[in-house]
Amino acid sequence: MTPIPFSAFLLLLTATGLVGADIKHVVFDSHARTREKFPTEYVTTLMHEYPVSEHKWPLKDLNPDLPSDWSSYKFLVIEVKSSTAQRFLLRIYTDDGMLAMRFHQFGGGVWIRAAVPLSYFQSQSQEGQDLAAVFNKPRNPFWMAVVGPFGPIKAVQSLAVAMVAPVGNPTLDIRSVRLSNEDPGSEILDKLPVVDEFGQWIPAKYPGKVKSLEQLKADWDREDKSLNPGEFGYCKYGGFANTKAKATGFFRVEQIDGKWWFVDPDGHLFLSMGVNGIGAGGAGTRIAGRETYYAAQPPADLPAGTSGRRPTAGDFYGWNLARRYGTGWDSKANYMAVRRMEAWGLNTARSVLSKEKRIPYATMLRAPQTAPVYMGMPDVYSEEFAHTADSSAASQLASLKDDAYLLGYFIGNEPAWPGREPELAGMILAGKETETQRKLKAFLAAGDTPARRREFVLAAFEHQLRITNRAARKYDPNHLNLGIRFGALPPDDVMRLGRLFDVYSHNIYEYTPDREWVAKLYKLTGKPLLIGEFHFGTPTRGQAPALMQVANEKERGIAYRYYVEQVASMPSFVGAHWFAWLDESVTGRMDGENYSFGFIDVTDRASDEFLQGVIAAHKRLRDVHAGKTAPFRQKAKVQ
């Protein structure tokens, strides 16, 4: 079928009402009065109301020849330039309602051609084992979060773009829109390169942007000379030194006077304040097919790390670490990470960072997998699964079981199927023959209903957890099982299975967790709560502002302090881990995601404004959790 051009795509200027000529220009009004409710994550616990600036055009105003039935087309192709990396919503309005996806243009400030698969408006993906893999869909110059609403595209009325809580009145230019059955490719149509030798977005302008290696070295030198351990009252294990409970030589949990705490190996009360991904591991980005985007790549003769590794193509953070530390750059960067943690009041890492300077850590076990795996659910009833669970636990835990610095281990992260149980059952039935499929067919022989499909999936999940937990306990009886880090909002019956763990972990992307929901969670599980992930980001450096947006770095610090102190005042709280240590690459990780959420940016520098809030929160943490001090009450500005 021949592609249909929008040769007369007319957009109205927001402020003036003038008709655009060659380039159609809209302004997202940061003072928009229209407000809409959105979930903070994909389908999370709360709906929040935000100002929304939307621009919508009926099809007849765009092109009278455009059909209303788009179901026979495969791609919506637009040429667009956003002035910002802040995401916008691409919306299709039909007779049945509104369809949408989140659109993230890398960097901003350049023209791109975006070929958007129309299937992403019609149904939720089943590809991927965790939430991010299901939702995130990358293209060369942008990425999409396919989160819905979904529906048929047979009775299209209008097309719209909308931005939630615009920061600084950003603009959007559109010069071409068409439908196509062929993928014309998604590309940058402007001057290249767009990423400099330090991994920064060239068109972006912001305070502190690196202009030279000399500037960067001066910043590094200043940090190295000024970085000293903070005064948080921590003992060698990161517990509160002037507290005392029973010492067992390993971390454990205990409820004292109605409040839950970790207890460190020496018997000190402990709240786990950590960051995911701490260390020298790079935030690589895909180069293949995008070689012209980058002004330079790490040269082959860079000094090797202690591991023998050299930064590879796309690893701009590793390149900057090699510039900073020279030979052995990875171990030196990990040692610096521990120094930073001590200065900022962080007490939990993801792994052993330095043998010379130990710090507690929580590790993620590689989950036993037996193919096929559907949205994170393996063939749990097969003999192979039980054998794999045993061998996997043995290989990973044997060397850790006597390490007093190990807080505990997670056994999974954000499985994608909770809330989609009947759909998962359908995938198992339609897939290859497995023991799980055989048991499902036998179970449904007595009646095939959505409720029974859901019942089977929940029973299978409980079986999976019991097998995995038993294997882990067999090879490590000393450490805490921190459970699966659930994401979004699983059904109550899924969360209730948290009773099988020592600690219930949940990734909670909110401005602070809802007290009633946390209380409900504790009633379901009876376990202390460890927040596995949370964060706040800004759209100011060429990256998207993460799942939870705030206006700038100062507001990030305020948001951190508000979140941490509010949740610390809840009795079931035992810790919170930020995601993540390092900003994602400006041109995205492998699934496209390019969030600005790090404690550290690609040039290995931290924001002092952000850290002010972090340090202030950590100094008050014990007294807030003990109920001696009221939590911080100032909320951050979103825009």
Task: Indicate where each model-derived feature is located.
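Aromatic-rich peripheral "rim/lid" segments of glycoside hydrolase catalytic domains that contact
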Residues: 425-437, 441, 579-639
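Aromatic- and acidic-residue-enriched segments that line the glycan-binding/catalytic groove
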Residues: 275-291, 358-371, 401-404, 411-445, ...
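Extracellular glycoside hydrolase catalytic/binding regions
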Residues: 293, 297-300, 347, 442-562
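Short beta-strand-plus-loop segments that form exposed binding edges in beta-rich domains
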Residues: 160-168
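Extracellular ligand-binding interfaces
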Residues: 50-147, 152, 168-170
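Short carbohydrate-recognition loop motifs
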Residues: 36-58
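Active-site-adjacent substrate/metal-binding segments within catalytic domains
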Residues: 205-362, 372-405, 452-459, 467
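Substrate-binding cleft of secreted/luminal carbohydrate-active enzymes
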Residues: 406-408, 412-413, 534, 548-599, ...
